[in-house]
């Protein structure tokens, strides 16, 4: 049945104040968004409940004081709502909805549709939004729908609370209204995609074209989430309650096109239980019951957060240990690094990295007056008085906007604006609403200006960046908002200033960014190329490319590299590369001659010719940014799994920040562990610097040996969070020892000969496996989980295994069980044995270690020979129940002929449950 909001359904609601009288009368009584608005129905008037129901969470605040505050707020809100609804035309059944599942919903005809007919995603025209002032009329509030709007009945609706709670419950709407005290406050809601079209004009994101009106302010009333969770007896953190998940009722095409998915997301328990955050299960907006587009009959409101966390048509609240696993929780509302495109994000699991999730809004501001294409005549009248610039500003997390500044000279000087805060902070001092700003400027100053730009500051002194930071989802765009000015002749004999906003919402054409984009495309048209004077013998039939053109092809969609002046398109080879796609992607768009030569065989060099597409124009080339020293070569398929930069450890200085840069390190200590094993300590460039290498990944050590670049992969033996240095345990392969390798190891012998104080370079991180903690991994970007780890290593292959063991044992809450089989030629060849044995003795329930050597002395307590099925069955878990994950690092014959066949016999799914470093 359609959603009905006849007031007869709300028998348990307390009587309200007088309804708001609007400046028009609907042709038929009834709420405009009701499916029965065209039938006889009582008018849905604005309601404010009696103050006795106001929520009071502080014992030291008397109900009398609280009620007095609520009375004044109710009157204040009532007047603002009355003003905001003035001059508001009726909503209608839009013909564009006629053949959609939303055909029953009445909507305001002025709303700008951003995604065609359906689903309904819209924002108000910016000047219209501002015309109505501080409180946005509900029909003009922006709408974000992922699918059709559910049809709901108040009397039939329930909200289930389950998961880690002592008393799982289902609440009816009448119970939520009558059994809980409520909160009522004004809050600004903002879509994380607000101002996205500006980003789409630079480079297309995955999102549609929000303008700068994806923001609205309403008065919300609802039940505090923390009260509901307390009623249900939410568990403690130790009891497993770490996250609170929300799930709506709509059926959506989630995941890989599967039907029946619900929109869902989650927040941390600490947020959910914090009364200062005013998180509510809202059932009223601007004094009326929720409309269908805004979540009737109940939705989540989380002030200061992005709109994507505020689930509409709320059906379930689930208290969990892990964050929501909902498709929309991971594949939406993320700010990924600018280098990540859609294919890379999917292949390498950027969606699942927690540091890129968006919760709180960032600081933002917009110029609303002058509006787009407004013309200011320049005459004797207008030049005698200042022109008033206006706009809005907001911040997230309850932070107050404390300053707004405007520049008309490109940022050389700034003028401080007057601020209009029309809200009172809550009792915890938090501000949930936008503010308005204004500034009077001289018209002649505008006449000489090329643009007007605005930036805001909040109480934590956060401000907006000057330049845009593009990201795949096009979210949280908050660079300076710029309005361009141009001189025009609006009337004969008169000049004026015409103002241009950067974009217009949706598919509307216009804005200065569209013009600039057109000019850039025209300028980028390829000129006719002449033969390069610097390459007189170059084959003139080959296509020629500039360095700037090569730089553009730096992603998995189009991956070009330069080797010896030749250009190769490696895109179709990415997935076939033995070392993984990121070995190429990390060098995409650069000259990687030196590194290619350092690690590739003659066979590989011949194969490269199949991908040659042209030659590099070298005249005048002097770019440092794509020199060999600034490119990175790796051996893994997960470029995504770089160390979390900045957000995860904001107080730390990370060495491995730029994957295309080499980091100089100095040898400060060298320890001889055995006749052919050394431990090297390298100091990072800055004393307080951390390497920044995720667990499970490795680095490249770079050295110039005999005038040629040499690169080798190593996994540090030091902990990932050690400050100022890192350590490598390296086996030295001396020349003349092994008949198959008479020259020995080039890099290991070089390291052994290095004096203290020598400088080398490192690159990274690299690798397709990352351990996230508590049994969770990402492998080629996809999440995996295991209760038990079967870890098989041979020789120096122990180092990545050692790194994971070290990380697990360091976390007392990580209960992952580890079973290690470590094979070597002799007992003396066992690396890091003292540490392994010490851990096995200290943590017998968490780590078990078994050694295998080809030949042993008398009294050897472990296995002799090679890794066999019998040894594996005795010392590692089988793969029957799927709780174990096997991983191996060692010589290829060991993995190919011993480890993998026997794992298959032990019921391991080799494709899913076996990792090779």
From Swiss-Prot:
CDD domains: cyt_b5_reduct_like (cd06183), eukary_NR_Moco (cd02112). The keyword NAD applies. Residues 660-772 form the FAD-binding FR-type domain. One of its GO terms (biological process) is response to symbiotic fungus. Binds 1 FAD per subunit. Residues 37-47 have a biased composition (Polar residues). Its EC number is 1.7.1.1. It comes from the Eukaryota. FAD binds at residues 712-715, 729-734, 741, 746-748, 799. Root, leaf, and shoot. Residues 1-72 are annotated as: Disordered. PROSITE patterns: CYTOCHROME_B5_1 (PS00191), CYTOCHROME_B5_2 (PS50255), FAD_FR (PS51384), MOLYBDOPTERIN_EUK (PS00559). Mo-molybdopterin binds at residue 191. Heme binds at residues 577, 600. Residues 57-67 have a biased composition (Acidic residues). GO terms for molecular function: FAD binding; heme binding; identical protein binding; molybdenum ion binding; molybdopterin cofactor binding; mRNA binding; nitrate reductase (NADH) activity; nitrate reductase (NADPH) activity. Residues 542-617 form the Cytochrome b5 heme-binding domain. Homodimer. When mutated confers resistance to the herbicide chlorate. This is Nitrate reductase [NADH] 2. The lineage of its organism: Eukaryota, Viridiplantae, Streptophyta, Embryophyta, Tracheophyta.
């Amino acid at each position: 049945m359609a959603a009905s909001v006849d007031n007869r359904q709300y028998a348990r609601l307390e009587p309200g104040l007088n309804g708001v009288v609007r400046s028009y009368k609907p042709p038929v009584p009834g709420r405009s968004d009701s499916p029965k608005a065209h039938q006889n129905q009582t008018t849905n008037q604005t309601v404010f409940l009696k103050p006795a129901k106001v929520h009071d969470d502080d014992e030291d605040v008397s109900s009398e004081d609280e009620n007095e505050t609520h009375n004044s707020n109710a009157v204040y809100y009532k007047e603002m709502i009355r003003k905001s609804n003035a001059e508001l035309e009726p909503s209608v059944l839009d013909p564009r909805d006629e053949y959609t599942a939303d055909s029953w919903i009445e909507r305001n005809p002025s709303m700008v549709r951003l995604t065609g007919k359906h689903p309904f995603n819209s924002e108000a025209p910016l000047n219209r939004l501002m015309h109505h002032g501080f409180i946005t009329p509900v029909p003009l509030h922006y709408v974000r729908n992922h699918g059709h709007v559910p049809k709901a009945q108040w009397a039939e609706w329930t909200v289930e609370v389950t998961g880690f709670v002592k008393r799982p419950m289902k609440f009816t709407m009448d119970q939520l209204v009558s059994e809980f005290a409520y909160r009522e406050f004004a809050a600004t809601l903002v879509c994380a995609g607000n101002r996205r079209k500006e980003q789409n004009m630079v480079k297309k994101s995955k999102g549609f074209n929000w303008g700068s009106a994806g923001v609205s302010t309403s008065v919300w009333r609802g039940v505090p989430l923390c009260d509901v969770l307390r009623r249900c007896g939410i568990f403690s953190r130790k009891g497993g309650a770490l996250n609170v998940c929300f799930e709506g009722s709509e059926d959506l095409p989630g995941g890989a096109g599967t039907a029946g998915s619900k929109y869902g997301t989650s927040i941390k328990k600490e947020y959910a239980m914090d009364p200062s955050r005013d998180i509510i299960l809202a059932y009223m907006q601007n004094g009326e019951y929720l409309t269908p587009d805004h979540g009737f009959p109940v939705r989540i409101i989380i002030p200061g957060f992005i709109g994507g966390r505020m689930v509409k048509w709320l059906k379930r609240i689930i208290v969990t240990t892990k964050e929501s696993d909902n498709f929309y929780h991971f594949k939406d509302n993320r700010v990924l690094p600018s280098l990540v495109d859609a294919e890379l994000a999917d292949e390498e699991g950027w969606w699942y990295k927690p540091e890129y999730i968006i919760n709180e809004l960032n600081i933002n501001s917009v110029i609303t007056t002058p509006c787009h294409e407004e013309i200011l005549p320049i005459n004797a009248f207008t030049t005698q008085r200042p022109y008033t610039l206006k706009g809005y500003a907001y911040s997230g997390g309850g932070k107050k906007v404390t300053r707004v500044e405007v520049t008309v000279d490109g940022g050389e000087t700034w003028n401080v604006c007057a601020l209009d805060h029309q809200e009172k902070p809550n009792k915890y001092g938090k501000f949930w609403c936008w503010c308005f700003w204004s500034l009077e400027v001289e018209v002649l100053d505008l006449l000489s200006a090329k643009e007007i730009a605005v930036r805001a500051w909040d109480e934590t002194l956060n401000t907006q960046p000057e330049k845009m930071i593009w990201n795949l989802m096009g979210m949280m765009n908050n660079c300076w908002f710029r309005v361009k000015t141009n001189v025009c002749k609006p009337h004969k004999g008169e000049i004026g200033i015409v103002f241009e906003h950067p974009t217009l919402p949706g598919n509307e054409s216009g804005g200065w960014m569209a013009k600039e984009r057109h000019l850039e495309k025209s300028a980028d048209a390829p000129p006719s190329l002449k033969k390069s004077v610097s390459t007189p013998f170059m084959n003139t039939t080959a296509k020629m490319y500039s360095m700037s053109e090569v730089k553009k092809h730096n992603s998995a969609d189009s991956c070009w590299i330069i080797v010896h002046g030749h250009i190769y398109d490696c895109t179709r080879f990415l997935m076939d590369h033995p070392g993984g796609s990121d070995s190429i992607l990390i060098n995409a768009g650069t000259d990687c001659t030196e590194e290619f030569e350092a690690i590739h065989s003659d066979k590989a060099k011949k194969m490269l010719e199949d991908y040659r597409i042209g030659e590099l124009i070298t005249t005048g080339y002097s770019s440092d940014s794509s020199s060999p020293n600034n490119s990175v070569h790796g051996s893994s398929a997960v470029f995504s799994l770089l160390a979390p930069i900045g957000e995860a450890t904001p107080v730390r200085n990370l060495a491995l920040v730029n994957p295309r840069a080499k980091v100089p390190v100095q040898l400060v200590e060298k320890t001889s562990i055995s006749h052919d094993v050394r431990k090297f300590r390298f100091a990072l460039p800055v004393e307080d610097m951390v390497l920044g290498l995720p667990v499970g990944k490795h680095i490249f050590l770079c050295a110039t040996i005999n005038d040629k670049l040499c690169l080798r992969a190593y996994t540090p033996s030091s902990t990932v969070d050690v400050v100022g240095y890192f350590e490598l345990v390296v086996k030295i392969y001396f020349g003349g020892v092994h008949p198959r390798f008479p020259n020995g190891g080039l890099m290991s012998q070089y390291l052994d000969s290095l004096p203290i104080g020598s400088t080398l370079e490192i690159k990274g991180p690299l690798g397709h496996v990352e351990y996230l903690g508590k049994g969770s991994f990402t492998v080629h970007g996809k999440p995996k989980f295991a209760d038990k780890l079967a870890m098989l290593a041979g020789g120096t292959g122990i180092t990545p295994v050692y790194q994971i063991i070290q990380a697990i044992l360091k976390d007392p809450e990580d209960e992952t069980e580890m079973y290690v089989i470590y094979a070597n030629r002799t007992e003396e060849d066992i690396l890091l044995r003292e540490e392994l044995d010490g851990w096995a003795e200290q943590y017998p329930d968490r780590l078990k270690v078994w050694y295998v050597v080809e030949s042993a002395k008398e009294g050897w307590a472990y296995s002799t020979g090679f890794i066999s099925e019998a040894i594996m069955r005795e010392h590692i878990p089988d793969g029957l129940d799927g709780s174990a994950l096997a991983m191996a690092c060692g010589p290829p014959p060991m993995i190919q002929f011993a480890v993998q066949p026997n794992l298959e016999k032990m019921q391991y799914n080799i494709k899913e449950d076996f990792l090779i470093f």
